Amino acid sequence: MNVIEGVVATPDARVAIAIARFNHFINDSLLQGAIDALKRIGQVKDENITVVWVPGAYELPLAVRALTKSAKNGGYDAVIALGTVIRGGTAHFEFVAGECSSGLSSVAMDSEIPVAFGVLTTESIEQAIERAGTKAGNKGAEAALTALEMINVLKAIK
């Protein structure tokens, strides 16, 4: 039996992080968690990490798509999407969270480049804060590790 598993130590990886500016007080922690995981655990060099800011979570799929097209030309091995969508009193949450998730998934499938989903979709600010580095860990760091592992899984499959 042949088992394929990826490792996270990927010193030569080139990784882009697309991050939403909206809810930046939470997203800044996700970004720090992602960068820390890439450098400390993944051993990714600082010069191989690119951060791209977009207005909000709804804009993430388009930016990630552009980054994956760059990846096909030797730009990036993976892209991490970071953001926070917090439920409010209107249907806006469902539209933004759903389109962001669907769009990122489509980009990953179409590009065949790892797109790690680090977008928090929470019921409250408190839940978002918990997932950005307090009680529930840092989902930015988790997304970074997912991206690194998927780089290696896909290399092993090909």
Curated annotation (Swiss-Prot):
Molecular functions (GO terms): 6,7-dimethyl-8-ribityllumazine synthase activity
UniProt-listed Enzyme Commission number(s): 2.5.1.78
Metabolic or biological pathway, per its Swiss-Prot or TrEMBL entry: Cofactor biosynthesis; riboflavin biosynthesis; riboflavin from 2-hydroxy-3-oxobutyl phosphate and 5-amino-6-(D-ribitylamino)uracil: step 1/2
InterPro entries registered for this protein in UniProt: LS, LS/RS, LS/RS_sf
Binding site for (2S)-2-hydroxy-3-oxobutyl phosphate: 89-90, 131
GO cellular component terms given for this protein: cytosol; riboflavin synthase complex
Pfam family, one: DMRL_synthase
Biological processes per GO annotation: riboflavin biosynthetic process
List of residues binding 5-amino-6-(D-ribitylamino)uracil: 22, 57-59, 84-86, 117
Catalytic activity: (2S)-2-hydroxy-3-oxobutyl phosphate + 5-amino-6-(D-ribitylamino)uracil = 6,7-dimethyl-8-(1-D-ribityl)lumazine + phosphate + 2 H2O + H(+)
Active site, UniProt feature: 92
Keywords from the named record: Riboflavin biosynthesis, Transferase
Keyword Cytoplasm attributed: no
NCBIfam families in the record: lumazine-synth (TIGR00114), PRK00061.1-4 (NF000812)
Assembly description: Forms an icosahedral capsid composed of 60 subunits, arranged as a dodecamer of pentamers.
Functional note: Catalyzes the formation of 6,7-dimethyl-8-ribityllumazine by condensation of 5-amino-6-(D-ribitylamino)uracil with 3,4-dihydroxy-2-butanone 4-phosphate. This is the penultimate step in the biosynthesis of riboflavin.
Family: Belongs to the DMRL synthase family.
The protein's name: 6,7-dimethyl-8-ribityllumazine synthase
The organism's taxonomic lineage, starting at the top: Bacteria, Pseudomonadati, Pseudomonadota, Gammaproteobacteria, Enterobacterales
